[in-house]
């Protein structure tokens, strides 16, 4: 069985999702992102998005594709080394 050796970090996309979400003007809230994700068929609530952005929740490949479509970025942008400020 696979053991995650990254401590509490369960994804590398969360920091990028948060940075991209916050880059919108006006800033997109986690609730607004959850609402947009539902339009693409992904049912996540604000709390799930918060856990993803903090690296506390795993993200599936299907979820990554929907996040990318919703945020209008490539999947590669979401899984690249976390964005720098």
Residue positions per predicted region:
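A short, Lys/Arg-rich alpha-helix, primarily the initiator
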Residues: 1-26
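Short, charged recognition helix plus adjacent turn
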Residues: 2-7, 69, 76-85
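Short alpha-helical elements of helix-turn-helix
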Residues: 15, 31, 47, 61-64
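Residue-level detection of the helix-turn-helix DNA-binding "recognition helix"
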Residues: 22, 38, 54, 83
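Short alpha-helical DNA-recognition segment
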Residues: 26-51
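DNA major-groove recognition helix of helix-turn-helix/homeodomain DNA-binding modules
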Residues: 36, 60-77
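DNA major-groove recognition helix of helix-turn-helix
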Residues: 53, 63, 79-82
């Amino acid at each position: 069985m696979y053991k995650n050796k990254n401590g509490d970090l369960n994804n590398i996309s969360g920091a990028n999702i948060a940075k991209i979400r916050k880059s919108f003007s006006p800033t997109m809230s986690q609730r607004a992102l959850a609402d947009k994700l539902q339009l693409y068929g992904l049912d996540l609530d604000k709390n799930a998005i918060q856990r993803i952005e903090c690296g506390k929740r795993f993200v599936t490949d299907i979820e990554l594709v929907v996040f990318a479509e919703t945020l209008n970025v490539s999947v590669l942008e979401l899984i690249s080394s976390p964005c720098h400020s």
